[in-house]
Amino acid sequence: MSSSSEPTKFKMVVVGAGGVGKSALTIQLIQNHFVEDYDPTIEDSYIKQVVVDGAICILDILDTAGQEEYSAMREHYMRTGEGFLCIFAVTSLKSFQEIDNFRTQALRVKDADKVPMVLVGNKVDLPKRDVSTKDGNDKALSFGIPYVETSAKTKQGVEEAFFTLVREILADRRNQEGQKKSDSKRAKFKCTLL
């Protein structure tokens, strides 16, 4: 991160099917509070200052609607995001299967083969699981992204999920910087054959 004491900003977008706990996870991180009632989100924005790996970070988190009818709005929000938390409920196989669509949408909107992303299996505090830890790990491995299991209710893994995304965004920024330097070196040393 930056060597100065100036906080670094990270624009995150939280995506996933309706009812998987996107808002509950975000509110748990921001306000240290668990929301019991399900109130479908259209769009909410949150900002929180945290310390990740000794550096001050500003998390700018956009909590999006999971319902399909808001897909066009979600695309607009995805354009501004640097990284994505793709959340499913371990109690819902359907929400797990829908993650592929959210990932594909993010890649298409960002016009990239890879974007900073973390797969999050939420609601691990509930006794009935339809998605195993192995299934979550396997999907994350196939995407080439980290996997974190969480519970908005017990706080398990909440910071880990968001902080892992910070690290993924940082790695992507470093990779892009390295690519720019490499491209500029190639531009400076062109050979001319006579």
Swiss-Prot record:
Q: Name one Pfam family in it.
A: Ras
Residue(s) carrying Cysteine methyl ester? 191
Membrane topology summary: Lipid-anchor
Keyword ATP-binding tagged = no
Top-level enzyme category: hydrolase
Per the record, what is one GO cellular component? plasma membrane
**SMART domains in UniProt:** RAB, RAN, RAS, RHO
Catalytic reaction list: GTP + H2O = GDP + phosphate + H(+)
Where is motif Effector region found?
38-46
**Keyword check for Isomerase:** no
Question: What are the alphabetically sorted keywords of the record?
Answer: Cell membrane, GTP-binding, Hydrolase, Lipoprotein, Membrane, Methylation, Nucleotide-binding, Prenylation
The catalytic activity of this protein is classed by the Enzyme Commission as 3.6.5.2
Name any one GO molecular function: GTP binding
Q: Which GO BP terms sit in this record?
A: signal transduction
Annotated positions binding GTP: 16-23, 63-67, 122-125
Q: Which residues, in ranges, are excised as the propeptide? A: 192-194
Cite the positions of S-geranylgeranyl cysteine lipidation.
191
* InterPro entries hit by this protein: P-loop_NTPase (IPR027417), Small_GTP-bd (IPR005225), Small_GTPase (IPR001806), Small_GTPase_Ras-type (IPR020849)
* Localisation: Cell membrane
PROSITE patterns in UniProt: RAS
Family according to the record: Belongs to the small GTPase superfamily. Ras family.
* Job description of the protein: Ras proteins bind GDP/GTP and possess intrinsic GTPase activity.
What protein am I looking at?
Answer: Ras-like protein RAS1
Look up and give the organism this protein is from.
Hydra vulgaris
